[in-house]
Amino acid sequence: MLTLRSYMAADEDAAIELWRRTWQKTYPELDFDARLPWWRERWRTILVPNSDIVVAADDGVLLGLMTVDPRNRYLDQVVVAPEAWGSGVAEKLLGEAKRISPSGLDIFVNKDNFRAIRFYEKHGFSFGGEDVNPISGRPVNKMSWRS
C-alpha cells in the first residue's frame, strides 16, 4: 500500500538511487552515474537542510519523492520511479507540495521534458517564460501554480 511520509536520513541512499534511475530513464543520452557525487553533495547540503521532503513508499520501497523549499515556494524535485509512472504517485506528491506551500509553487521544467510539462499543466501550473537552469545550463520553462 502506498504511503506518503516525511523523508528520513535513512532514506538517503534509496532517494539518490531513485533520482539517478528516474533521470537516466528520462534522458538516456546523459551519464547520471557520473553526476552522482555532485547530486549527493547537493542533496546533503542544499535540499535536505532547506526543503520539506516527502517520500512515497510501498512496502518500504521508495517509489517517489518531492522537495519543496517553503521559504520561496520552489518545487525542486518531483521524482517518480519509472515503474510507477501513471500510477498516481506524482499526483499524490504534488498534492503534498501544494499542502506545504498553499500560496503557490514555482518550478523549472526542462523544455524537452514534455511528459512533465503536460503533467504540471494538467495540475494547474501555467507557463511563466523561458529561462536557463542555473545548475544544469539546460533550457527550461518556468512554471507556476497559485492557489
Predicted feature locations:
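Acetyl-CoA-dependent GNAT
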Residues: 6-83, 94-96, 100
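Active-site acidic-Proline motif in GNAT/NAT acetyltransferases
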Residues: 81-87, 111-112
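Conserved active-site alpha-helix within GNAT-family acetyltransferase domains
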Residues: 91-92, 112-129, 135-137
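Conserved N-terminal entry element of GNAT/NAT acetyltransferase domains
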Residues: 1-10, 145
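Short hydrophobic/aromatic beta-strand or adjacent loop that forms the aromatic wall/cage
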Residues: 51, 137-143
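Conserved GNAT acetyl-CoA-binding A-motif
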Residues: 100-112
